[in-house]
Regions:
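Acidic two-metal-ion nuclease catalytic site recognized across multiple nuclease folds
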Residues: 1-3, 164-234
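Walker A/P-loop
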Residues: 261-282
Length: 816
């Protein structure tokens, strides 16, 4: 046998199934020597059994074609001769290698080649990607894949991927490759052989674009380019960005310009889909010369989106110095990561994650962990690696620290982009953060919730139990022991009561008991919990975002914080939204503490490309069990998916979303199941799945612009939960003022949320969408007329029976 060196044999098999009884139906082999493709081979194989319809559709193979193909025994020798002396490479190597080895074994050949998996190599060397299937990798890296699920085409693409990976490795410093090799036992197969080959031939010289500190390699920070002056003419700036200006956008930008000239505090309302972001940024950048502009958006998803889209355009065309600032926990703490590298961790997944981070450090300019594509897989390890906002003067990475760097960039840049949660937290600590600056708040109505969150505190109940258990071990005072035991009992009781859905009164009684016990507790280390449980305020239980089994206790202080109380007078404020008007008797400006703010409204025109369909005979959501209603929704989605159009389903509750997800028999994307919101958005936009089930920020914090047509489904009207702290407080305020909390606030807010939902899929001209509202209260309740009247101003509204839904969608799809 020849010496195994840098000869790679890339194999792809098509088979009758992916199970243990799979039979080979097609073989594709590509041979790489000295970094070049030198040979290829392909053959069909007769499985002597009919193919499933799914396999026929996937591969394009037919029973008739395979009936003419050779048996595996007739091609086994040729295949073995090709693969015998090489390193076996495949995408998901376990399937191909095991199936081929088994078939060769029955023909008298033993396949014992080392194995390389291009999936795990791609995960390490392309850490920013979210999916690692062969078609998606080819799409991301520009590798041709003409006939997916054809063995030779897939093998050719996998070979090109391997060559791409080798090139990527060759660009990395030798010291980094050495460190990766030291950790390569985290890889499942012999994939380290590829790294080892590149390492042997690698120069010891480090790339001039990288700097080495304590064995870590960082991308050198580029100096900002000299900013280009923007024109006072909005249309010229839009033209330079290679964009088409819309009439409504120009009108909006003109109004923004006037407000920035004359008004210290102003609010402007404009319809969705007109290009509001450029509409306020370009006038601001052209008019505000000697002040920094701070832009706050509702979510980190939108923050990232602006940096990737508008921010990228502003940097490229105008060299605008723009920076994105988030809370410290969003950044990698280098000291913590460095310490973790010194530890001999036995967890294979964590070691592989550390390999990813080592590569990522050579690429990132920000250290923002959101850049890592599959971050959700590593949440368990991130707790100790996230930045805590503190930096010791003795740190090994004082200069490179990402949080410190981000703070410095935030001070120096022209345009600072942040999110509402970080903005209000920072303002509470230091109002000077926006002194003498222009503060633009997009979706300004969402600041109300961010301000409410400042008043809230949350503790994980199991963490309290763990702390009590530790204290009980060393506590000698008998009375304090009893108090700790009582606290432990009440915590366990709360978990049991919440998970079983028992009486709310029992929970309130137990919370009252905890208040009493903590007021008597004098054990060291419990000071924060004593303060928390003895403070005045409302308390409630809820499951965490990540798990229904993890229960947390939350509280809110009485009263509300007004935005005006946090923002200094020297700061100019511009609030922007598609939905600022609440009702005739309730003003958002009043709720924010800016009753004197100038208000401008850009009237919305009725969109011809948008239709709202009300289903009048769907089961009544308030009188139907969650199981039955979820089944009805799932059945409707199965009918609608036959139109082969993207479907976005917007839920108001996590339990309903998960119930529908469990019942859907087709592959789909679901929030709380398939990764972070921004990852789901990207996967849906790329067409990876036809159906996306979303809640929370999908109503108003995520935009979909890539699909020319989207079907939206709203199973339930988005009324705010009257028990939510913010809603409860505002309701109480309005009642004290003699107003009707439902008609003056809750109903208008539901209409606002519906309109925001309609705007998710109307982000550009000629984009079309149809929204199905299944909650029949909209046609049966008195307040439904108010909702319909408001929606009718912006879109065509139809009322149909469930049996007419398919026909209605078909008609809309076929309209010019």
């Amino acid at each position: 046998m020849k010496t195994i060196g840098n000869r790679y044999v890339v194999v792809d098999l098509e088979a009758t199934s992916t199970g243990s009884k799979a039979k080979i139906i097609q073989v594709g082999i590509v041979v790489i020597e000295d970094g070049k493709i030198v040979d290829h081979y392909t053959t069909d194989v007769n499985p002597h059994e009919p193919l499933d319809a799914h396999i026929k559709e996937l591969t394009g193979l037919t029973d008739q074609r395979l009936a003419q193909a050779p048996d595996f025994s007739q091609v086994a020798r040729k295949i073995f001769d090709l693969v015998e002396d090489g390193i076996f490479v495949a995408h998901n190597v376990q399937f191909d290698a095991n199936l081929l080895a088994e078939n060769l074994f029955f023909e008298g050949y033993e396949l014992r080649n080392p194995r390389v998996d291009t999936v795990e190599l791609a995960q390490v060397f392309f850490p920013e990607l979210e999916k690692y299937s062969l078609p998606i990798l080819c799409q991301e890296l520009g590798i041709p894949l003409k006939h997916a699920h054809t063995a030779l085409s897939d093998a050719q693409a996998t070979a090109e991927l391997l060559l791409f990976l080798r090139e990527k490795m060759a660009q990395l410093p030798k010291g980094l490759l050495e460190r990766l090799l030291e950790m390569a036992d985290a890889l499942l197969y012999e994939s380290y052989l590829v790294i080892e080959e590149i390492y042997r031939n690698q120069s010891i010289l480090t790339s001039p674009d990288l700097v080495e500190v304590q064995g870590l390699y960082f991308k050198k920070t580029a100096s900002p380019l000299e900013t280009r002056k923007l024109s006072q003419d909005f249309s010229k700036n839009i033209s330079l960005l290679n964009l088409e200006m819309r009439e409504e956008q120009e009108h909006f930008a003109k109004e923004v310009g006037l407000l920035l000239k004359d008004e210290p505090v102003s609010l402007i309302q404009a319809p969705t889909g007109i290009g509001k972001t450029y509409g306020y940024l370009l006038p601001a950048l052209s008019q505000v010369e000697n002040r920094q502009i701070v832009l706050s958006v509702p979510t980190k998803i939108l923050q990232n989106q602006i940096m990737e889209e508008e921010g990228k355009g502003l940097k490229e065309v105008f060299h605008t110095d723009i920076h994105s600032l988030k809370g410290p926990h969003n950044y990698l703490k280098l000291d913590a990561f460095y310490r973790s590298l010194q530890e001999n961790d036995e967890n294979r997944l964590f070691r592989r994650f550390k390999m990813q981070l080592l590569v990522w450090l050579t690429e990132t300019e920000t250290g923002d962990l959101d850049e890592i594509g599959q971050l959700y897989r590593y949440q368990h390890f991130l707790r100790d690696l996230r930045h805590d906002g503190n930096l010791s003067s003795k740190s090994l990475f004082v200069t490179e620290d990402f949080w410190k760097r981000s703070q410095e960039r935030a001070q120096a840049c022209k345009l600072l982009v942040t999110n509402h949660a970080y903005l209000v937290t920072r303002l509470e600590d230091n109002p000077e953060f926006v002194s003498d600056r222009l503060l633009i708040i997009d979706e300004v109505q969402k600041v109300l919730l961010a301000l409410e969150n400042l008043l809230q505190e949350t503790y994980d109940i199991q963490s309290i139990i763990d702390l009590v258990d530790k204290a009980l071990v060393g506590e000698e005072n008998r009375i304090q022991q009893r108090i700790l035991e009582s606290i432990r009992f009440e915590c366990l009781y709360l978990i049991e009561q919440f998970q079983s859905g028992k009486s709310r009164k029992n929970i309130l009684d137990s919370l009252a008991n905890l208040h009493q016990y903590f007021s008597e507790l004098e054990v060291e280390g419990f000071e924060e919990l004593v303060r928390y449980f003895t403070a005045e305020g409302d308390y409630w239980l809820e499951a965490t975002e990540t798990s229904q089994k993890k229960i947390q206790i939350s509280s809110t202080k009485s009263g509300r914080i007004l935005l005006s109380s946090l923002v200094p007078d020297s700061c100019q404020v511009l609030g922007v939204s598609a939905t600022l008007e609440i009702s005739q008797r309730v003003s958002l400006a009043d709720l924010l503490g800016y009753s004197e703010a100038k208000f401008v409204k850009i009237e919305a025109h009725k969109k011809q490309d948008q239709e709202v369909v009300l289903v009048k005979d769907f089961p009544l959501v308030t009188e139907t069990s969650i199981e039955v209603y979820a089944k009805e929704v799932a059945d409707l989605l199965m009918d609608v998916q036959a139109f082969q159009q993207p479907i976005l389903v917007l839920f108001t509750a996590k339990d309903m979303l998960l119930a529908v997800s469990d019942l859907l028999p087709v592959s789909h994307l679901a929030q709380y199941k398939n990764g972070a919101v921004h990852q789901l958005k990207k996967r849906f936009e790329k067409g990876e799945q036809q159906i996306l089930l979303g809640a929370a920020s999908f109503w108003e914090g995520v935009d979909f612009s890539s699909h020319p047509f989207v079907i939206q489904v709203v199973p339930r009207l988005p009324f705010q939960n009257p028990q939510e702290p913010l809603t409860k407080k505002i309701n109480q305020e309005l009642i004290q003022e003699g107003k009707n909390a439902f008609y003056d606030y809750q109903l208008p807010m539901a209409i606002i949320r519906l309109k925001q939902a309609l705007g998710r899929s109307m982000r550009r001209e000629h984009q079309r969408s149809l929204t199905l509202i299944l909650d029949r209260r909209i046609v049966g309740k008195r307040y439904g007329k108010q909702i319909v009247a408001s929606l009718s101003k912006e879109a065509t509204v139809k009322t149909v029976s469930q049996s007419e839904v398919d026909e209605t969608i078909d008609e809309f799809l076929n309209e010019l």
